[in-house]
């Protein structure tokens, strides 16, 4: 298993229930495919450096996890097709 770090920015237009649902969906995707979440941190709503999709704020979430490369590819695919995700980044960390 490899170590990864992901940060994603959710739309500020999502209500709390929708936001928590998306966060749980992403966490479950990792765990159900044999991955392990080692760190999870919700940074909350912050101002963006520049507007993204005409929005000036976003809800930031940071997560570290261990998994196979297939899981990170699937997570990226799900980020891409999820409407509430403004931006995301997944990097492999070397421990």
Curated annotation (Swiss-Prot):
Example of a GO MF term: small ribosomal subunit rRNA binding
GO biological process assignments: translation
GO cellular component: cytoplasm; ribonucleoprotein complex; ribosome
Listed InterPro entries: Ribosomal_bS6, Ribosomal_bS6_sf, Ribosomal_S6_plastid/chlpt, Transl_elong_EF1B/ribsomal_bS6
Superkingdom, natural source: Bacteria
Entry annotated with the keyword Transmembrane helix: no
Keywords: Ribonucleoprotein, Ribosomal protein, RNA-binding, rRNA-binding
Family annotation (HAMAP family): Ribosomal_bS6
Family statement drawn from the similarity comment of this UniProt entry: Belongs to the bacterial ribosomal protein bS6 family.
Physiological role: Binds together with bS18 to 16S ribosomal RNA.
Official protein name in the record: Small ribosomal subunit protein bS6
Organism listed in the record: Caldanaerobacter subterraneus subsp. tengcongensis (strain DSM 15242 / JCM 11007 / NBRC 100824 / MB4) (Thermoanaerobacter tengcongensis)
Native organism taxonomy: Bacteria, Bacillati, Bacillota, Clostridia, Thermoanaerobacterales
Gene: rpsF
């Amino acid at each position: 298993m490899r170590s990864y770090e992901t940060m994603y920015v959710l739309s500020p237009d999502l209500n709390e229930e929708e936001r928590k649902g998306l966060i749980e969906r992403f966490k479950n995707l990792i765990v159900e495919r044999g991955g392990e979440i080692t760190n999870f941190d919700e940074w909350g709503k912050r101002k963006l450096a520049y507007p993204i999709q005409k929005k000036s704020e976003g809800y930031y979430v940071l997560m570290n996890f261990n998994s196979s490369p297939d899981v990170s590819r699937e997570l990226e695919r799900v980020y891409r097709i999820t409407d509430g995700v403004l931006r995301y980044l997944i990097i492999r960390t070397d421990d």
